A protein has these predicted regions:
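Short acidic/polar hinge/loop motifs at secondary-structure boundaries
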Residues: 4-31
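N-terminal periplasmic accessory domains that precede
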Residues: 11-13, 27-28, 38-60, 73
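Outer-membrane beta-barrel translocator domains and adjoining extracellular loop/strand segments
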Residues: 40, 99-112, 152, 157-173, ...
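Transmembrane beta-strands of outer-membrane beta-barrel pores
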Residues: 61-67, 81, 92-96, 151-155, ...
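Face-selective signature of the C-terminal outer-membrane beta-barrel domain
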Residues: 84, 128-154, 173-324, 331-335, ...
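Outer-membrane beta-barrel signature, preferentially recognizing the C-terminal barrel domain
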Residues: 282, 346-395, 399-401, 417-431, ...
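Gram-negative outer-membrane beta-barrel transporters
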Residues: 423-497
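C-terminal beta-signal and adjacent terminal beta-strands/loops
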Residues: 521-589
Length: 589
């Protein structure tokens, strides 16, 4: 298959809606081979190609209510011949959100303690337009060319923050205009060679206006104009060889270049704030190469091992790294399967997060950039035992070096709450998980998932409050499915999580109860889905800081209950395909 950015829920929907005769193979990989250009655990689904003439499509509409009502519509169409497959997709969504945050800060400054109480209302509204066109040309059974264009546009975004409290009252309005265009080309040959590349252009423009009145009647205000321009290129080449006795080798190279330009200009500044304008660029290059070896036995036992070398540079930061991947599956028999895997992963901070910038969120809170913020590297070791092909017992160990996260900090030189991404020494987790399926006849299926682990988080350079903390975490999830006839089903999902930590933050326990139904009708051409998630409005944990002289309470769970409806109509036997998504996680201000 191809890389995707689909969530696990979307992937589950895809698998349930795809008939068995359309699937060529489905593989669960706890340690993905490097030629997939993703790291960690993946599900690789390969769909059979069409060999006839057809026109298929899907029309859908959705509604969601979480304080505000949102909704959208989407259309997917596919035209297929033995040589050509053309996919066209367009979707439009009207998005409205609302969040409330209650804050209590006992801020120590010059040996005095200031109690600051604040309520902040955050709202946003926008129209998002997504378009995708993909053309696949089959030269023959084994040689294929794919060209795809993906666009995403949010032209009139409006975010508003209204804060009211004992220290300050403020009003901030932010208007945004974001555009993303991507084109991808991929060629697969019958000799095991695959080459490809893509280009992404992202532009973002925003303007802000903030007005603040402090408790001493002094006033601060500013207007701001900012933006981001990103050009990103990537190319790769992979080669696979199938050898005798079910041995296989693979090797490949890849190169990615990204050029980022950010600017932020303040104007009409008044009061006791001293903002600085930002105008900076980043040039990032990543060069990788890998070699892999795999073997399959007739008994079902298999193993694979690979190593990926990477040279990464951004600004004055240069680093060589090697990322090992290994997996072993041993079948003692169909009733007993043992799996062992080692995987590595790397996550990068957003480009704007790496700039030297300060953005004032209200009269008390500010967001600071972190020049020199490094990518985090994650190492995972997993051992799994599968009993009777359904009961799963696992052990895992995870070590993440240079882990970064955004944690609030009460400044020691002024009354300001700072949000800033910081690299930690590491985050380490060790634990176990159990998955137990349950069923009664053909009408009831359930899956109980239990996870227990201990986390250790260490950072020697978090402002003037270094930390080294440990915490046990337990998670339990029960997923129930009830079938009423062939076309109607209900689900009830409960999830509970014990208290946890994030840096200096303490996170309270949380609970999420979700109920839903799905009805297929009109000979499976139509489906109606209804769902209510977080029925008890308790999925967002309360947060607090009680660390050295830092004292902070935050509650952002005022309204998290979500009701959603989705209607889908398909014609021509259309089944939604898994497609490559464009990663824009590092874009935006």
């Amino acid at each position: 298959g191809k890389p995707t950015t689909m969530t696990s829920e979307q992937l589950e929907t895809l698998l349930r809606n795809t008939p068995v005769n359309r699937v060529e193979k489905a593989e669960v990989m706890y340690s993905a081979p490097p030629e997939l250009h993703v790291r960690g655990a993946v599900i690789n689904v390969v769909i059979k190609r069409s060999h006839d003439y057809s026109f298929q499509g899907e029309l859908s509409t959705n509604y969601q209510n979480r304080y505000f009502s949102s909704g959208g519509a989407n259309g997917n169409f596919r035209f297929s011949t033995p040589k050509i497959t053309l996919d066209v997709m367009y979707g439009a969504d009207n998005i409205k959100t609302m969040e409330y945050t209650d804050l209590l800060s006992r801020h120590t400054l010059n040996n005095n303690v200031y109690e600051i109480m604040q309520n902040e209302k955050l709202s946003s509204k926008s129209w998002m337009h997504n378009v995708r066109t993909a053309l696949e040309y089959n030269f023959n059974e084994k040689n294929h060319l794919n060209v795809a264009y993906t666009g995403s546009f949010t032209p009139d975004g409006h975010n508003r923050s209204i804060a009211d409290g004992s220290f300050q009252q403020s009003n901030l309005d932010k208007f945004t205009d974001n555009k993303m265009n991507n084109i991808t080309v991929q060629y697969s040959s019958g000799i095991g060679l695959e080459v490809g590349g893509d280009y992404t252009r992202y532009t973002s423009d925003n303007s802000q206006t903030m007005f603040t009145q402090l408790s001493d009647k002094s006033k601060n205000s500013y207007t701001l104009t900012g933006g981001q321009r990103i050009d990103r290129y990537s190319i790769y080449a992979d080669q696979k060889h199938n050898l005798t006795n079910n041995w296989g080798i693979g090797y490949g190279i890849s190169y990615r270049y990204a050029k980022d330009y950010d600017f932020q200009t303040y104007d009409n500044v008044s009061g006791n704030i001293k903002p600085e304008n930002t105008e900076a660029g980043l040039n990032e290059q990543t060069t990788g190469f890998y070699f892999s070896l795999n073997k399959n036995w007739a008994t079902g036992t298999s193993f694979s091992i690979s190593a990926t070398g990477e040279y990464y540079t951004i600004g004055n930061y240069h680093k060589w790294a090697v990322y090992p991947q290994a997996s072993l599956t041993y079948l003692k028999g169909p009733q007993h399967i043992f799996q062992l895997s080692l995987s590595t992963d790397k996550s990068y901070p957003g480009y704007w997060d790496m700039q030297s910038s300060v953005t004032y969120l209200n009269g008390y809170s500010e967001l600071q950039g972190t020049p020199g913020l490094r990518p985090m590297t994650n190492y995972n070791l997993n051992g799994t035992y599968i009993l009777k092909q359904k009961y799963i017992f696992g052990l895992f160990y995870t070590h993440t070096s240079d882990y970064f996260a955004q944690t609030p900090y009460q400044a020691t030189d002024r009354l300001a709450l700072i949000y800033k991404n910081t690299n930690w020494n590491y985050m380490r987790m060790i634990g176990a998980n159990v998955i137990l399926p349950l069923s009664m006849g053909n009408w009831y299926d359930a899956r109980l998932t239990l996870v227990g682990m201990q986390a250790r988080q260490k950072c020697d350079c978090f402002f003037d409050v270094p930390f080294d903390r440990k915490k046990w975490l337990f998670i339990g999830t029960l997923d129930n499915s009830f079938k009423v006839g062939k076309n109607l089903s209900f689900e009830l999902i409960g999830n509970i999580q014990t208290p946890f930590i994030q840096g200096t933050l303490d996170l309270a326990s949380s609970f999420n109860l979700t109920a839903g139904m799905k009805w297929n009708f009109a000979k499976d051409r139509c489906s109606l889905t209804a769902r209510c998630s977080d029925i008890s409005n308790s999925s967002m944990p309360d947060m607090k800081v009680r660390f050295k002289e830092q004292y902070l309470d935050m509650d952002s769970g005022a309204y998290t209950r979500t009701v959603s409806l989705n209607f889908t109509y398909r014609f021509g036997g259309y089944k939604k395909q898994k497609v490559k998504g464009v990663d824009i996680s590092r874009f935006g201000h």
